[in-house]
Amino acid sequence: MAISASLVKQLRERTGSGMMECKKALVETDGDLDAAVELMRKKGLAKADKKSGRIAAEGIIAAKRSEDGHSGVLVEINSETDFVAKSDDFLAFADGVARLALEEKPEDLEALMACELNGQDLATATKELVAKIGENIQVRRFVRYGSSGNTVAQYLHGSRIGVMVELEGGDEQLARDVAMHVAASKPECVSEDDMPAEVIEKEKAILVEQARESGKPEEIIEKMVQGRLKKFINEQTLVGQPFVKDPDQTVGELLKGAGAKVARFVRYEVGEGKEKKEENFAEEVMAQARGS
């Protein structure tokens, strides 16, 4: 039977697929639009499964926070290209995933993928987006903070870096300032108490060996090591770092002056720890550095 251009257009609007694919599906289903949608869906999902093996190291960090400011989420959602990560379909999907993570309070990623988004579970919705966009899409990870009295603040830097801070005492502006600092300075933990003992001992052993090469007496070496170890700890901990907006004081001093304490923080960066083409990554980092 003859397939009208209007019918092809309707199928394209419903599936987001190409013109020739839509026309072929309509021919196979004798012009039955609903049957063609189902056929396209089946074929699309099959293609999506094949695409799921591709590296998805681009994407965005999405954030949502409750109206009372006591809970929030960060979610990393990956795509294969930055172009797709900026598309309306991808951004709407990411916003929906973040909303689910905040409202449904899933315990882990598996539970999140079972939550309902637009009438279907998130796992199926993800596959359908893969079929529509033509790239591997992955909901990689999420974190949720929630408390009855503490302030939760978030900071997003260009959608590629996301930070969430839970603050005891202080106010929302302070919490946001601390979140911005974490985005820029990348502390490993809040304070020395949170640093694994083996990390400190390993660094101390390295510093001792370096100091002994100076040939100085042991008591001098001990002082050298203690000074350098303190510097190392300050560089790694949030409270020991100079505050980015006022380097004359540390974050710890800033918090103390406000009668506040950071209960916890998390920092996400798109694609960290994932395989990525080296030349593209280097160019992107340089471009970000020039633009910041």
Swiss-Prot record:
Residues 81-84 are annotated as: Involved in Mg(2+) ion dislocation from EF-Tu. Gene3D superfamilies: 1.10.286.20, DNA helicase RuvA subunit, C-terminal domain (1.10.8.10), Elongation factor Ts, dimerisation domain (3.30.479.20). The keyword Protein biosynthesis applies. One of its GO terms (molecular function) is translation elongation factor activity. It is found in: Cytoplasm. Transmembrane segments: none annotated. Keywords: Cytoplasm, Elongation factor, Protein biosynthesis. The keyword Glycoprotein does not apply. It comes from the Bacteria. GO terms for cellular component: cytoplasm. Belongs to the EF-Ts family. Associates with the EF-Tu.GDP complex and induces the exchange of GDP to GTP. It remains bound to the aminoacyl-tRNA.EF-Tu.GTP complex up to the GTP hydrolysis stage on the ribosome. This is Elongation factor Ts.
